[in-house]
């Protein structure tokens, strides 16, 4: 195995090192012989030979530089040396690594969420070729042409026309924009009488083919599945298949019941695919032709005016987006010209309508628009936190460099150059960053999972995958490298530039102390400045959240239970369902502890709404005038149940049925907007151009029914008995704790209709808290970042002052020997610390105000220069800094003059 040992020697340079040592010894021996021949004593000859030969270490380094693999070998040497030095000082290493792990982990966690929501492409084939036909209706409601005339959604006839006249796309697919709640049961297995609530969509048969998503089990849809008279089939998502059916492979080709109707499971999607709506996981898909059966509504397939589909296409290679958009809009105008206009104004408006093609690699997402600003704000916050952490580690390295002064001096005396020393110190910093980054990834994974659970989108959980990908790993590496530069470069440069002659003196610990103290003070001011800005921002967001919680919402949130039910799965038309509603309200009202119970189509603070354009008698709306109002269908006791006060007129009565005069209740915003007066009882209007007149029988106070940040819009409430609709929200007002009624109400619903899917059951107060999920998430995270920043500032100030006190012990001893009191010494140290803190506060307040202007849209009832927040943040920093400075100040006053003077 001699060849193997030879190979190892070549790689590890053992033979080169042995040859170099032999050659240097030979030169030294020859030089010693020459010294003896010249008259030098034999005992002194070796020393004279070394002096004549020169610096052996330097010659070895120069020789090694001429060998190959030098950089890699030196890096390995530096890494081993860095590891040894960190092991010798575990407290320093643990503190620095933990500090960096917090900063890097927070950055990675927030970026993981940002990446999943804003940057990550769909898990499909070649996502860059996908194109969205409009961005979809991100509000969650069906929408036609939107301002300024851009079509968000498509009708089924328009989709068919676009696909038939397509020449520039490989194919075009469509999907139901909003998910439908579905009751799912396995037909061949016995049911326990409860319903599982799933989210489903109708999609075109080519949906999975256009996306390039193969089936994990079974198959995707075939064109025959979307033909008239086809057998009902369904494709399940991998996650739902696992969650609901235990990943049972026998489910494929079995029958499941969706809302009581049989469907054959033909396939399972691959892991990770949950649809093209980012943040909203779809559990199952059915062909578009199944829409009436699936949604339990009239057919949407023939109405060219009904906009309910979001469309996605795959461009052919090398086709420009602009060319495809021009072609699509020609088809759109041809299609619109064939639909008779409802008015001359509509005919004019149609000419401005267009479809805007958008890159589809990242899919549709209302979550993206909603969370763009908060995520950017949080990224800025964790960036500031990382800078504060780096300043702290920089303080630690400066203090450590002082203790290693003589070590650096000896290494330079032995021939190490400044560049060599600088590289060694940066390698130590890089090792700290790498270890901090590795620990930060673990923190990031845990924190990111928690962020997803806390995130809320209009009352529904956000479903995104935050598993680290190449982009997240690259960001972590980049942050770790940037941290190395931020905290390691200045101490390394300053430590490697010591003066060799003076540094070797015993009193050398004061050398370069003036520069180090000035630099340390600058870092402290910078750290306090950033901390004040972060705390002010957190304070503004927390106070804004409290303002939202305490605002006048227009309804009474106490003692109210909200229950979501899926009326579509009942299997009845709206008219027969009225009897079911009467029975439900009667039985729930009879429960002990219930005062009122009411049903509505739209749940409070759900973010959903139905709209209509009203017509005032004898009036023609001015061109471009907005006549849109929100519409809700309710039962008589609804307003008592949710606590919306009556301002004028009367509430709905049980007698307001199909045979009584058509009536409506409006809110004050509608009275002001359309009638210019509060006294509108008895006035009439039409809910749409084709309906009969409605008489206003009452006016209720304005209420934030859609969202707490939403402006109150005109609302029309219609009695469900006069205009039968499927209602989906039950509101129950209790005499005590509404949460205690949840199980009784659920049981009552299931007793009446055993297989009605009961969705979310929550108190109205909890719904209010849930609707503020985004604001709460930002406020809580910002507060956490602010507290961590405050902790880091206190640790940094304590460490820097302790180091300065240790360096100035001689000076302090002289002062005390000359008559300075202990209190005077304490005040001297405290005064210097407080001056630095006050300077940081003075710089931090303008920075905080300037940064606050960038996030004014996230504030509610506050201005960026809110004096209470500014004073509170400044006082918190000042108080913490005073406590952190007190211990070093007290230690300084305990220095004994004789102990300090002994070193002079």
Show the residue positions of the predicted features.
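Membrane-helix entry/capping segments
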Residues: 49-92, 124, 151, 180-181, ...
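Short, strongly hydrophobic transmembrane alpha-helices
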Residues: 91-117, 121, 388-391, 433-438, ...
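Structured, solvent-exposed hinge/loop segments at the ends of secondary-structure elements
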Residues: 3, 33, 46-52, 56-62, ...
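Conserved positions within well-ordered secondary-structure segments
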Residues: 515-904
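Alpha-helical transmembrane segments of integral membrane proteins
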Residues: 62-94, 363-367, 396-423, 427, ...
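Small-residue-rich transmembrane alpha-helices
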Residues: 356, 394, 430-503, 540-543, ...
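Negatively charged linear elements and acidic catalytic determinants
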Residues: 1-98, 314, 343-348, 356, ...
């Amino acid at each position: 195995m001699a060849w193997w040992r030879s190979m190892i020697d070549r790689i590890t340079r053992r033979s080169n090192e042995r040859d170099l040592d032999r050659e240097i010894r030979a030169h030294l021996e020859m030089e010693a012989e020459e010294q003896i021949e010249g008259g030098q004593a034999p005992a002194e000859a070796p020393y004279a030979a070394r002096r004549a030969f020169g610096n052996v270490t330097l010659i070895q380094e120069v020789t090694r530089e001429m060998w190959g693999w030098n950089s890699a070998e030196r890096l390995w040497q530096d890494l081993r040396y860095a590891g040894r030095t960190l092991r010798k000082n575990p407290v320093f290493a643990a503190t620095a690594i933990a500090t960096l792990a917090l900063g890097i982990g927070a950055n990675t966690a927030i970026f993981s969420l940002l990446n999943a929501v804003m940057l990550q492409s769909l898990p499909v084939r070649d996502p860059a070729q996908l194109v969205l036909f409009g961005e979809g209706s991100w509000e969650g409601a069906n929408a036609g042409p939107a301002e300024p005339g851009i079509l968000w959604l498509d009708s089924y006839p328009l989709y068919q026309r676009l696909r038939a006249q397509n020449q520039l796309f490989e194919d075009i697919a469509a999907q139901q924009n909003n998910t439908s709640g579905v009751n799912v049961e396995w037909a061949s297995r016995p049911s326990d009488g409860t319903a599982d609530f799933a989210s489903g969509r109708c999609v075109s048969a080519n949906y999975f083919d256009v996306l390039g998503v193969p089936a994990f089990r079974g198959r995707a849809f075939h064109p025959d599945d979307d033909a008239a008279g086809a057998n009902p089939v369904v494709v399940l998502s991998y996650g739902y298949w696992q969650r609901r059916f235990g990943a049972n492979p026998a489910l494929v080709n079995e029958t499941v019941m969706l809302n009581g109707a049989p469907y054959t499971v033909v396939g399972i999607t691959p892991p990770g695919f949950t649809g093209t709506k980012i943040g909203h996981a779809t559990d199952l898909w059915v062909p578009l032709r199944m829409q009436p059966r699936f949604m339990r509504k009239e057919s949407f397939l023939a109405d060219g005016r009904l906009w309910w589909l979001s469309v996605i296409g795959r461009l052919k290679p090398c086709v420009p987006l602009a060319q495809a958009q021009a072609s699509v809009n020609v088809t759109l105008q041809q299609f619109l010209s064939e639909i008779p206009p409802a008015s001359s104004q509509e005919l004019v408006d149609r000419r401005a309508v267009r479809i805007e093609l958008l890159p589809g690699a990242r899919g549709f997402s209302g979550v993206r628009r909603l969370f763009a600003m908060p995520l950017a704000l949080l990224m800025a916050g964790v960036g500031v936190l990382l800078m504060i952490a780096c300043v702290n580690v920089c303080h630690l390295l400066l203090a450590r460099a002082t203790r290693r002064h003589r070590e650096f001096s000896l290494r330079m005396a032995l021939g190490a150059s400044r560049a060599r020393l600088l590289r060694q110190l940066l390698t130590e910093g890089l090792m700290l960053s790498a270890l901090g980054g590795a620990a930060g990834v673990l923190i990031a994974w845990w924190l990111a999972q928690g962020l997803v659970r806390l995130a809320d989108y209009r009352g529904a959980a956000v479903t995104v995958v935050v598993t680290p990908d190449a982009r997240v790993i690259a960001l972590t590496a980049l942050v770790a490298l940037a941290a190395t530069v931020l905290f390691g470069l200045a101490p390394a440069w300053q430590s490697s530039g010591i003066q060799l002659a003076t540094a070797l003196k015993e009193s050398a610990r004061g050398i370069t102390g003036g520069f180090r103290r000035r630099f340390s003070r600058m870092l402290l001011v910078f750290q306090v400045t950033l901390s004040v800005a972060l705390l002010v921002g957190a304070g503004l967001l927390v106070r804004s959240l409290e303002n939202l919680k305490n605002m006048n919402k227009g309804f009474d949130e106490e003692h109210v239970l909200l229950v979501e039910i899926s009326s579509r799965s009942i299997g009845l038309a709206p008219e027969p369902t009225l009897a079911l509603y009467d029975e439900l309200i009667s039985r729930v009202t009879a429960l002990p502890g219930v005062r009122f119970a009411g049903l509505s189509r739209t749940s409070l603070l759900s973010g959903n709404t139905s709209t209509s354009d009203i017509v005032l008698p004898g009036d023609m709306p001015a061109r471009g005038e907005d006549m849109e109002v929100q519409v809700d269908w309710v039962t008589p006791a609804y307003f008592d149940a949710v606590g919306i006060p009556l301002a004028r007129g009367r509430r709905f009565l049980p007698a307001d049925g199909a045979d009584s005069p058509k009536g409506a209740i409006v809110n004050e915003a509608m009275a002001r907007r359309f009638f210019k007066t509060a006294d509108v009882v008895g006035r009439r209007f039409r809910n749409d151009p084709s309906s009969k007149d409605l008489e206003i029988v009452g006016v209720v106070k304005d209420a934030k029914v859609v969202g707490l940040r939403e402006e109150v819009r005109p609302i029309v409430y219609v009695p469900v008995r006069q205009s039968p609709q499927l209602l989906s929200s039950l509101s129950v007002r209790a005499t005590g704790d509404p949460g205690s009624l949840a199980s009784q109400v659920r049981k009552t619903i299931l007793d009446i209709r055993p297989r009605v899917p009961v969705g979310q059951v929550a108190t109205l107060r909890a719904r209010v808290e849930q609707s503020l999920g985004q604001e709460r998430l930002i406020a809580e995270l910002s507060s956490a970042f602010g507290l961590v920043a405050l902790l880091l500032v206190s640790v940094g100030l304590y460490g820097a002052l302790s180091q300065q006190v240790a360096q100035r012990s001689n000076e302090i001893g002289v002062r005390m020997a000359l008559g300075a009191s202990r209190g005077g010494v304490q005040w001297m140290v405290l005064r210097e610390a407080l001056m630095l803190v006050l300077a940081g506060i003075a710089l931090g307040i303008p920075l905080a105000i300037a940064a606050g202007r960038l996030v004014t849209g996230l504030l509610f009832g506050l201005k960026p220069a809110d004096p209470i927040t500014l004073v509170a943040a400044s006082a918190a920093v000042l108080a913490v800094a005073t406590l952190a400075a007190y211990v070093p100040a007290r230690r300084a006053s305990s220095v004994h003059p004789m102990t300090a003077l002994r070193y002079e």
